[in-house]
Amino acid sequence: MRKIFWASDSTVQTNKFMTYPQTGIGQVFSLYTKDDVTVVNYAKNGRSTKSFIDEGRLQRIDEEIGAGDFLFIQFGHNDEKSQDPARYTEPFSTFMENLEIFINVARKHGAYPVLITPLERRCFVDDKHLGIGAHSDYVAAMKQTAEKCNVPLADLYSMSRTELKKAGEMGSRKWFMYFSKGEYKNYPDGKTDNTHLRYDGAVLFAGLIAKGLQEAGGVYADLLVEEETLNEKEIGYRTCLLYTSPSPRDTE
């Protein structure tokens, strides 16, 4: 059994019933993987590379990950919070240094690290045009780290910007926690959240990461199912609404 350990933030985390319809990318990623692949989702709301390490979450991965496993490293949203010293990292120094710590944890166990640039926010200007990206320095820093350390990179940031531009302000709302009052019991007053995802968004952006793995080839592409199998699995996901962790244990 191959395992994907995922270190990230709220855009990836597995959500509980009381926050439905919020859905993390890691929560649905097994839709794209073969049956012998398990996602162990350590992603947690509000975490940066710094706080993830400081809280011992990387240490827990260090204790569990093994040869032939994968470590997906996806940060940026919270590293940029300059007013919060518990989370902030400077993109071209401490952020890059922390990424290398994650990479080294994977490699010392014979596991495969993968860097994933942060998901773009729904940052439309005047309700028409997608604004300047919020994470550009962290994306550049992650790309530099990938090149320096010879680690494959799935550029979710660029791919998600492309999808947001194509869908437009109105069309992209269905992917995010952006909806009117009365649509969901957990949010009777509605929500205008341009960062966190609903099911359709999580599936879409998980698919973009899968595309990046396919392009990387080799052991990374070998994680993924064929297109025909994907369609069958997606029908099952929609039918069952699997808002529970696919991980073998609770990673809270």
Where are these regions (language model features)?
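Active-site catalytic microenvironments for nucleophilic, acid-base chemistry
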Residues: Y32, G212-A216, S247
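Structural motif
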Residues: S48-G56
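Serine-esterase "nucleophile elbow" of acetyl-processing enzymes
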Residues: M1-K44, Q59-A67
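Glycine/Thr-rich phosphate-binding loops of Rossmann-like dinucleotide-binding domains
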Residues: T14, T49-K50, K81, F124
